[in-house]
Amino acid sequence: MDMQVEKRHAFEAGGAGALKLLLPVDATARSRWGIQYAKTCRQDGRDVAAALLFVAEQVTSWQVLRFRTQEEIRRFQAERANHLLVDAARPLEQAGVPVQVQYREGDIAFHILDVAEQLECDEIVLPLPHPRWARLISLDIAREVLRRQRSVPVTLVDTLGIPERGCRQ
C-alpha cells in the first residue's frame, strides 16, 4: 500500500537549481545524520530541498497477527511514521529547507531507490554502514541500497552529517 502521510512544503519549492535530497528516516538516531548534512549544505549557501521518507516493513509475524489485524497494524505504522516524519522535518524547516514527507510500505531498499527516482532527487543521503561485526545484529539498509543502486547517487554521512571521503557512489 503506497500512501503519502503528509506534505509539509512542496518539494519543488526549493527552486529549479535546488539540490534535491532524499533522507530516509526511521526511529533511530543514525537515520537523522542526513538531516545535519542537508542543514550544512543550506548553511553553506546551497539551495536545498529535502524529501523525508519512512518505509514500514510489512508485518508477517503470526505472533503479532494473532492479536491485531493487518489494517490495525497499518494504521499504527502510519501514525508512528507521521510522528517521526513531523519530528524529523522540524530542524530542516527551522533551517529554511523546504520539506516533503513520504510514507511507503514494503521493501525498504526498493522504496528508497524508487522514491528517489520518482522525485528526481540528486542524492540519497544515508548514514555510514554499520561496522561489519554490527551487521550480524542489525539490518544494514545503507549497504543494501548501495548494492541495488540505480540512477541516483548515494551519499554516506557520519554522525555530524559529514560525507565520508569518496563516499558518493
Residue ranges of each PLM-predicted region?
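Intrinsically disordered or low-complexity boundary/linker segments at protein termini
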Residues: M1-W33, R147-Q169
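Small/aliphatic-rich secondary-structure junction motif
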Residues: A10-R68
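Short, surface-exposed alpha-helical segments at coil->helix boundaries
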Residues: R74, A78-V86, L139, R143
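Hydrophobic structural packing positions in well-ordered secondary structure
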Residues: L21, A38, I112, V125, ...
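General small-molecule cofactor/ligand-binding pocket signal
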Residues: A51-L53, Q100-R104, T155-V157
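Glycine-rich, Arg-bearing micro-motifs that act as flexible, cationic patches
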Residues: L126-R147, P163-G166
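Acidic, proline/glycine-rich short linear motifs
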Residues: F54-R80, R165-Q169
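Structural beta-alpha unit
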Residues: M1-A10, E93-I124, G161-Q169
